[in-house]
Amino acid sequence: MDQVDMLQELNFNYWVELGVGLSVMLSAIIWKLWPKLKPKEDSEENSMDWRIHSDIHEYLTELRVLSDCARAQLIRFHNGEYFMDGVSMRKLSLTHESVSRGVAAEGGKKTNLLISLFSPLIEKILKDEPTINFLSSEREGFHKSFMEISNVHSFMILPVKYKNMVSGYLMVQWCSSTKTKKAINNIVDISKLMVHTRDRIQVLLEEQTRKSQ
């Protein structure tokens, strides 16, 4: 091997060793900094989620207080388990709720329920009309029995949509005839408030969905 070949080989080995060394060094730096960088991303995402959840609860509380209802709720649709033929079970769950003092919350029992059990409510949701519905006028079924257990006297319900598709609903419940009569007397203001609250919640949910994609 002549001197030129030796120099070329030494030069080649030098660059190989330098490249390996830099790769190891860079990997070590990334490994060391990753724990600091990753939580920051998670922290920002978690912060946004908490803000959205907090705002939704604030909107529901405002709706409950101004409409003088017992409960203001946001219920969302989702996929559940699967039937034997592979078809997904469509379900609903209460995700946010504001209740008056002394009123029992429904969050614990309104979770992972088949949407088909609430078909009469779905029909009202699709109408998209902020009207007061008397529970006594509802046809017999699971949805009526469910609300009777919660002492519901009347309710108002509106769809919550994502990309023009119904993804859940907003609901307020009155638990006494006195409160219902008061709501009827203020139906115009309550209807506007209901629509306004629904629209604000939709904006928040759309933001949350965009950030998670």
Where in the sequence are the language-model features?
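Intrinsically disordered, low-complexity terminal regulatory regions
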Residues: 3-102, 198-201, 207-213
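Juxtadomain coupling helices with adjacent low-complexity linkers
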Residues: 167-213
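A short, aliphatic-rich beta-strand micro-motif
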Residues: 153-161
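Short beta-strand or tight-loop elements
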Residues: 70, 151-153
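Well-ordered, non-membrane alpha-helical segments in soluble/globular domains
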Residues: 52-59, 115-119, 187-197
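Regulatory sensory and allosteric helical modules in signal-transduction proteins
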Residues: 92-150
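A structural signal for short, well-ordered beta-strand segments and their strand-loop junctions
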Residues: 71-76, 133-134, 157
